[in-house]
Amino acid sequence: MRHTRIALLALAAGLVIISLPVSAHHGNAAYDMDKTVSMKVTITGFEFGNPHVQLFFDTKDDQGNVLHWNCEGTNPAMLTRIGWTRNTLKPGDQITVFVRPNKNPDITVVLLIKVVLANGQVLESRNPV
């Protein structure tokens, strides 16, 4: 009986330790969760795969310089349930994105809230924000 308790305690401790990196991976600490930014962008890439969908797009700054962005969405299974497909976006598409900006303004990695396609269709990301 004593060995069973020790084994169960060790198993529980191991599960807690193993789950910590997963929990850290899903943090939103890099993003300003109190701000929403909208941008008109041109899609340069779209990766519809696990663990998170990635949008790559370009914008221009006030001087006309091209800025390259990486935008993290939620997982493909969730997006599929709300209307996204791997063909939703393709390079060259011009859309509007709504994102949570990075806390560091020099980093062009943002968190997706939703997109508005050229035809006006709105697709949410449904990130747990």
Give the location of each predicted region.
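Sec/Tat signal peptide C-region and signal peptidase I cleavage site
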Residues: L20-A24
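Bacterial N-terminal signal peptides
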Residues: L8-S19
